[in-house]
From Swiss-Prot:
Keywords: Signal. Pfam families: DUF3221. Transmembrane segments: none annotated. Residues 1-27 form the signal peptide. This is Uncharacterized protein YobA. InterPro entries: DUF3221, NA-bd_OB-fold. It comes from Bacillus subtilis (strain 168).
Amino acid sequence: MPKIGVSLIVLIMLIIFLAGCNKNEQNGDETKMQSLVGYVVLKDNERAILITDTKAPGKEDYNLSEGQLMNKFKNNIVIVGLSEIDNTDDLKRGEKIKVWFHTRKESNPPSATIQKYELL
């Protein structure tokens, strides 16, 4: 009898342990998103280039090519993917915006697919 009791206790503990290890937490949108503020200097259907400097880019900066922008604003530029955004019609060059995203890729320049944005 005592062997059955000990075996039963061990079996119950093993089941509890395995159930705890198999717990699959679904964070979904509950995961904390990162954000940043910047100025849209280039935009197409799939992505936009943001300058994250505290002051607005000059008028002449909006006429620069993508390569020229990357050279001029080396550490203050982020490429944001727009694939998760339903409507980007109000997102225009020169707009100051705040964007939210889950992960920023540490490429050169950094990039992120934004989940939402707000015009400032």
